[in-house]
Structure formats: structure tokens, C-alpha cells
From Swiss-Prot:
It comes from the Eukaryota. This is Vacuolar fusion protein CCZ1 homolog. Keywords: Lysosome, Membrane. Pfam families: Intu_longin_1 (PF19031), Intu_longin_2 (PF19032), Intu_longin_3 (PF19033). It comes from Gallus gallus. InterPro entries: Ccz1, CCZ1/INTU/HSP4_longin_1, CCZ1/INTU/HSP4_longin_3, CCZ1/INTU_longin_2.
Amino acid sequence: MATAAAAGAGQEKQLAPTLLSFFIYNPKLGPKEGEEEKKILFYHPNEVEKNEKIRNVGLCEAIVQFTRTFSPTKPAKSLHTQKNRQFFHEPEENFWMVMVVRNPIIEKHKDGKPVYEYQEEELLDKVYSSVLQQCYSMYKLFNGTFLKAMEDGGVKVLKERLEKFFHRYLQTLHLQSCDLLDVFCGISFFPLDKMTYLKIQSFINRMEESLNIVKYTAFLYNDQLIWSGLEQDDMRILYKYLTTSLFPRHMEPELAGRDSPIRAEMPGNLQHYGRFLTGPLNLNDPEAKCRFPKIFVNTDDTYEELHLIVYKAMSAAVCFMIDASIPPTLEFCRKLDSIVGPQLTVLASDICEQYNINKRISGAEKEPQFKFIYFNHMNLAEKSTIHMRKTPSVSLASVHPDLMKILGDINSDFSRVDEDEEIIVKAMSDYWVVGKKSDQRELYVILNQKNANLIEVNEEVKKLCATQFNNIFFLD
């Protein structure tokens, strides 16, 4: 939905970018004249008249064909028009996804009538292309590939799966909140000392031994990843689902430290705080349903279908993934609860205490003069002091949108070349913005020092690298 913000006395309104349409088609499904509708596998909004759907899909086909003559392997990525921008993605051969986003608008009043000015240069291709790619990755995580659906039951099954998934998922796309973090789609890692990390490793080994049907495990604390047995690309999209969808739905007042009283009303009156975030709500109910969401991983080679069991105690969450051919019983869920619950409760307390001790040792940080985003392409590690909270519905970036756009522009420049480089920009608002790319790592810094010169800005960034990333090599 468009958010309108009145801008002062001029009665200007700023209308955010919005999703105009989203569709998926396969040109091979309706090659003959009169069969064009067969190509369309999904179209949002559905109430659009049939001929308009066919016309829009036909136009996209023509654009793809035209651009293929210049770039056979990488045809159309995006199309810019005055009012909107179209993004194209071919995740599987001949399956095309298209997302049409309306450009932001400034609404002014002239002679008592509204006048609309489209902001054609505001949207960043890289950001919204990444959002479109994530739409596919999220679909694939819960449904497998488009081809798999075709093999399971032809076009009919694929259409049903697309409708069921995207009808809900598109409602969670808040395009006005998208920024550089959507390009990275990285993972925030929880900082840990070696001793506590070994405790967690030992806990995972014990759990996998006790619950021998567990194939993969992932461990998170405070919505940050500590350990994962999954492939990186599968974990990055599962992490996005957990932190932006599942965990926010189960928010509760978190308990700190081991001194908190144990809740006596826990299922089975066990002395722990463990509970299932997916699966049975009440283990004492003999009728309780043990249904877990299914996920698909390693779709490029072994193609594994798994049940996703997410279990949480205080701020610690564990994902157990078991083969989908083994249906989890209520008995198994009770066993998991009795084994994992008490140990995870103690472990969560230990992590919390250790984290607080480390925080005290490092001392209270005063508000620094800079904010930064860091991303490592090798392990997908992401760190941002710019975002206070990043969920699908809200991106509380603590800097002005103009600065976020500069960060995106620098990132686009970086992606065009393979060499390491550094870019320094002075914004109109007198902020300095620095981008550093070195050895598969990227660092973006925003400095609030309007009287500084280039040399001083460079020194500040060097200091930041020394304090925040002392074990990371950045080229000077």
C-alpha cells in the first residue's frame, strides 16, 4: 500500500513505490495462436481482464526476445518507463517471473488540482531484482522447483502451488522498505567466545545422536545464527524466513539469566522453557496434530524434502530437519521436548550470561560518529548498525533514504568490476559515504563529519576497520 507523507507547507505528498503486478509464465506452454492464455501460470492481481494479462505477458516475451539478440545468455533484467519499472527473472529454463513496480510519486497541487511527478531515478535495479529472486527462493524452499511441480502433476499442480504460495507471500512484500540488505540477503552471526561455542557444538552432537532421525540442525540465538549444517544458499533463505516471518509471529517477553522462576504450567510440568514454534501446540493433548512445514533443500543435486521442526527456549532456537518420508509422531515430539527442553534452557542461560560478561568487559559503547553495513560474500556474514530493525513490514533505517540510495549506487558500481576498490562520496546533506570492496568483502560507512576533508575521512575509516574488523584484512 502507498504510504503518503505530507511534506510541509507546499502540501506535497510523497507516495512510496508499490507493486502493480506480478506474474509467472512459460512461453513453451502456449506456442500457438489462440493458446496464449496457457502460458500464464500465475497473475497478480487476478481480477485483471484476461486480454490484458495476455497482452502484458506478450509484451514481456517480446522484450526478452529482443534483448536476447544482444545478450543471448543474459537477456532482459529490467525495463524503465516513466511510471513504472519492470523486473525480469528466469529462475528455471523457460519459466519467467516478472514484477512491475510503480515508481515513487510526488503529488503536488496546482490550481487546486493534483499534479503527479514520477520519480524515475529513485528505484535501484539491483535491490528490486534481488527481491524478485528471493520470491523464487522462498517459493522453492517450501514447494521445490517449478519443474518438480510439473513432474508431480503437470501445469494444474504448478498453478495450484503458485496460487497458494504467492497469494499470501506477495502481501508480505513491503517494497518501500527494500534496500541494500535485500541485495545481500546475508546472515547475522551471533558473537561467541570459544568455550560457549564448544558447548553448543556438543549440545548439537548429543541431540543428533539422541534423535537419530535428525538430518540437519541449525542453532540461533537472539535471531542470529550460531551454527548450521545446511548448505549456505539454503540456510540464507531459511534464515530470512525464520527472522522475518516465523520468529516475529511468536514474539514473547524474553527471560534473561538463570535466576528466572520456572513456569510450572509448562506442558508436562517439565522444568524448562522449551516449546515448539512449528508442530504441536500442546503435548498433553492426545489429539494434538504433529504437522510440520516441509522444506526442500539441495534442489540442484540430491533434492531433499524435509520436515522443519523449530524449537525454542528463551532466546535460543534450534531447527531440526528430518527426512520428509518419516512422519514425526506425538511420541517423537514428546521425546524431543523432554530431551531438548531442559538442556536448551540451561544453554540459553549460559549464552545470555556469557554475552553480558563480554559486553561488560568491552565497556559501554558511546554513540559513534559513523554507521556502517558490512557483508562478506564467502560466509554471507552481514552486520549493520544502520538498521535498528529489519522485518518485511518495517525497515527502521536510522539514516535518510537519500544516503541509503547512495549506498545502493556504490554497490552497483562494485558489482560491475572484479577488482578491489574504494569509493568516497560527499552527500548534499554534508554526510560522507565511503564504500570499500576488498577480497570478497564489502564495507559501507556513513560519517557525520561535515567539516572533515578526504584525508580525515580516510583516517576515520581506517580506525573503524581497526576497531570493528581487527581480524579482517582490508586493502589500503
